[in-house]
């Protein structure tokens, strides 16, 4: 999800002048990694693969035109664009104003640094306008306690109900439904799980 959101931020920043995006991550290293993906995607807009198709060539030409019109100035924590748009990464981003905010791994932050988690909500999230977008994606670290769990539980209770522009819309993408994570079971012996994992999946 975070790579998709990073590419969406790049797209919105290129085609909307003065559009400000923020990436809040559990560590600055993780946040700057996402900035690196955005920078790589921008640099690759005019990439032509070996044995290109007509579509490849057309996309590369479009990318060349975009890069000619809108230049990017990347740094470790920020990508600034010549159209006034900007993408910034940090661990709380308090004091900034964003139209699009991605909060990654709030479960981890809430479990290990609850005061910083509260600051993310009261500072960065509350500074996003009501017509802005906040994407909050996280594992379930911390279990059934902490700020992330409270927010997730509240959004789960709203599933199927009318939502205002200020309500969270809940999406769940379970990792165990990804075929890449399946183990091949032996027909003769099957596959068994330790008791703690069985309890995890039952919860």
PLM-predicted stretches and their roles:
Residues 1-203:
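Phosphate/NTP-binding elements of NTP-utilizing enzymes
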